[in-house]
Amino acid sequence: MDVQTLMAASAGAVASRLLCHPIDTITVHKQTIGKFSFKTMPLKAYYRGLPISLTLITPATCLYLSTYVEAKRRFKPSVGEGAILYSICGMTAEVVSSFVWTPLEVIKARTQISQKGSVINTISTLARSEGLKGFYRGYWMGVAIYLPTTVSWWVCYEESKKYLQKQSNWDISVIAPICSALGTVVATTISTPLDIVKTRYQVATSSAMRKAEYGLQAEKELGILEIAKLLFSKHGVKGFTRGLFTRMCYIMPSGMISMSVFESFKSKDID
């Protein structure tokens, strides 16, 4: 993986985060507290958690994409081009990058629903109350969620990219966002129910979440199954689709921007 590829991945990650972070904040509010109002939420609140996102999103995205590219280079001679290769590479990239993504998601989600909205306060409170394991809260669930999500996304993306490259003379900067959007629709629909449970589990011990959702039960540690049962009992099936459209509105442009920039710079290296 050369420097140009890493710079391209970084540029795409930063650009997509700056443009799409407010939508992500709205999604987290809907998935956790369940309350959101444009009238009562100040403008700066939409960017809660942005500093930590920008700090970690770049190395996390670079790690994810570089792992995928390297895995593709190593496995392609023995596996061949196709869905199996994309699945293996996607899973490898997800498992490796989740070591960075999980703490980011925990800190970001807690900061976004916090009244103070301070990253430093979120980190210090989490470290003091839960220690290191608090930052990796929901790691294995995240891996379980994002493995099928990653596989479905990369298979849709790569297969549709091959098809469009054969059937059209479009530039990769046009093909990449189209294929990314298609992969996002499929992957997001598959992953949203479990992602909601994961997000609620990651912020379950925060004061904002306890006050909004769990009441007296907040004093005890809530497991993943308990959170899922509480969600179903209070909101029914639709509770597991909360923020689906908003989440898709965030992930889709974010992925389109990232992949368009990345592919424009490094499409020859990937292929």
From Swiss-Prot:
GO terms for molecular function: iron ion transmembrane transporter activity. It is a multi-pass membrane protein. SUPFAM superfamilies: Mitochondrial carrier (SSF103506). One of its GO terms (cellular component) is mitochondrial inner membrane. It comes from the Eukaryota. It is found in: Mitochondrion inner membrane. The chain crosses the membrane at residues 5-26, 49-69, 84-104, 138-158, 170-190, 240-261. Keywords: Membrane, Mitochondrion, Mitochondrion inner membrane, Repeat, Transmembrane, Transmembrane helix, Transport. The keyword Transmembrane helix applies. Its main location: mitochondrion. GO terms for biological process: iron import into the mitochondrion. Disulfide bonds: none annotated. InterPro entries: Mitochondrial_sb/sol_carrier, Mt_carrier_dom_sf. Gene3D superfamilies: Mitochondrial carrier domain (1.50.40.10). Solcar repeats lie at residues 3-74, 81-163, 171-268. Belongs to the mitochondrial carrier (TC 2.A.29) family. This is Uncharacterized mitochondrial carrier C4G8.08.
